[in-house]
């Protein structure tokens, strides 16, 4: 959703340590590429805050007067679509090390030519200082960039660069792109599943989704490495913004909570990283989920309900579903599911709780995945069962009658993720075969989550 639904157009800010294969400076470069006396790197020195431990160090090594075209560029997500009828609200944090001169900030086109007014700020403060301004393009540019131009030799630090169009949804008061929210409203989803799939469990406890770290000012949100490289999560769409989006489009909210289990696929397929299911304090995860629910629907006299009100929303949010884990399965999962379900449903019995299923068992692709539930847990405690499918066009077409054979009176059906690989438009037609089977079996009370609802066409996963 970056540079799409969440309309902060620069690429991720430079904060997180390098994790696995991701580049912490993704989106940033210096210009001209052949030679420029301007160098950028990630630094841990003098961070903005305890939450925000990393920033970008700019080192200008020569007199910039001899290199008037030297720039630091942020290309956004494969280029910024700049429009003359929109102004762009700039904010960034700067800190001098030994730099005492202005820097100029402006927009450029694909060739690096200036296409907007210039915001000039003096960097003399050795403390982190926030600077703001407004940039207005002079022409439409499909793949523009944000340019930062040093004016002197020396070193300074940059962090949390933000560039929002002034016409976001809700009269510019939200972080959401107006036309996409309007399209979502027209699509009229009954619910929105958040934060989604693999973001929930990550590949270790650090990279799991921790909702409390996504609240408050963006500069205090640490963000996190994303399994879907090449970029990091900024968590600009945090836990609070998720519920705002649900309200904007008239959808119920489905929050997917972590169970303390990491991505089972990585445990199985990536032994070189020593991924393994870890021992965690399950009571802490249960309390965290209870806090999350309280933030969403708790009275303002409660701790987290009061926090929601402090963040501008005293009324409860439209939370209806809690999914316990994402693609977690096996005896360990069911043991945790039972404990989590008992604790959450005891306090919030009106919410709908959803269990996970194994993604794929070779040789049993056509089985009713729910038939193993009694082997692990009381079936009465599984009200809705989430099945995920990633397979070929041929397989999808064979599933047209799949749900006709499902046993009735068991858990309700939820297809939380469906990915059919193959060429367009045949993959869409094959997806339609499964959807027809779901609709034909309405007595299973089916739920279906589109995945993905949107994507950046220059960066496609699960093509």
Where are these regions (language model features)?
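Glycoside hydrolase catalytic-domain groove-lining segments
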Residues: 224-227, 231-236, 241-244, 331, ...
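Active-site groove signature of glycoside hydrolases
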Residues: 149-151, 159-160, 165, 195-198, ...
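Aromatic/acidic polysaccharide-binding cleft in carbohydrate-active enzymes
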Residues: 200, 261-264, 410-463
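An active-site-proximal structural segment forming one wall of the substrate-binding cleft
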Residues: 135-138, 143-147, 168-190, 234-249, ...
């Amino acid at each position: 959703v970056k540079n799409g639904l969440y309309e902060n157009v620069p690429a991720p800010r430079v904060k997180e340590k390098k994790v696995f294969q991701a580049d912490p400076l993704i989106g940033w470069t210096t210009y001209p590429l052949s030679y420029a006396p301007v160098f950028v790197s990630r630094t841990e020195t003098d961070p903005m805050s305890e939450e925000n431990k990393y920033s970008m160090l700019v080192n200008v090594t020569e007199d910039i007067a001899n290199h008037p075209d030297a720039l630091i560029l942020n290309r956004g997500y494969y280029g910024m679509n700049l429009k003359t009828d929109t102004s762009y609200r700039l904010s960034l944090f700067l800190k001098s090390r030994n730099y005492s001169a202005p820097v100029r900030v402006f927009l450029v086109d694909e060739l690096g030519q200036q296409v907007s007014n210039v915001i000039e700020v003096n960097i003399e403060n050795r403390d982190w200082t926030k600077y703001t301004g407004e940039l207005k393009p002079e022409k439409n540019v499909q793949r523009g960039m944000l340019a930062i131009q040093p004016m002197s030799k020396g070193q300074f630090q940059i962090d949390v660069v933000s560039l929002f169009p002034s016409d976001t949804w809700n009269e510019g008061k939200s972080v959401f792109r107006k036309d996409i929210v309007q399209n979502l409203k027209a699509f009229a989803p009954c619910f929105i599943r958040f934060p989604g799939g693999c973001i929930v469990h990550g590949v270790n406890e650090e990279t799991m989704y921790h909702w409390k770290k996504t609240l408050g000012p963006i500069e205090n949100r640490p963000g996190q490495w994303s399994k879907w490289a090449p970029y990091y999560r900024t968590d600009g769409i945090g836990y609070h913004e998720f519920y705002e989006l649900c309200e904007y489009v008239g959808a119920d909210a489905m929050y997917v909570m972590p169970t303390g289990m990491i991505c089972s696929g990585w445990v199985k397929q990536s032994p070189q990283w020593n991924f393994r299911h870890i021992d965690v304090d399950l009571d802490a995860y249960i309390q965290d989920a209870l806090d999350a629910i309280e933030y969403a629907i708790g009275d303002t006299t409660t701790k987290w309900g009061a926090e929601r009100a402090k963040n501008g929303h005293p009324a409860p949010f439209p939370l209806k579903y809690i999914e316990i884990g994402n693609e977690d399965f096996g005896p360990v999962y069911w043991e945790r599911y039972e404990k989590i379900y008992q604790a959450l449903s005891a306090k919030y019995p009106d919410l709908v709780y959803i269990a996970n299923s194994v993604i794929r068992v070779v040789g049993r692709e056509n089985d009713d995945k729910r038939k193993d539930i009694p082997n692990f847990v009381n079936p009465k405690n599984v009200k809705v069962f989430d099945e995920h499918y990633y397979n070929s066009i041929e397989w999808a077409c064979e599933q047209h009658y799949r749900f006709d054979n499902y046993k009735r009176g068991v858990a309700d059906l939820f297809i939380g993720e469906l990915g059919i690989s193959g060429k367009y438009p045949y993959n869409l037609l094959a997806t339609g075969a499964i959807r027809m089977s779901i609709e034909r079996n309405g007595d299973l009370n089916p739920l279906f989550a589109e995945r993905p609802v949107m994507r950046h066409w220059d960066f496609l996963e699960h093509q």
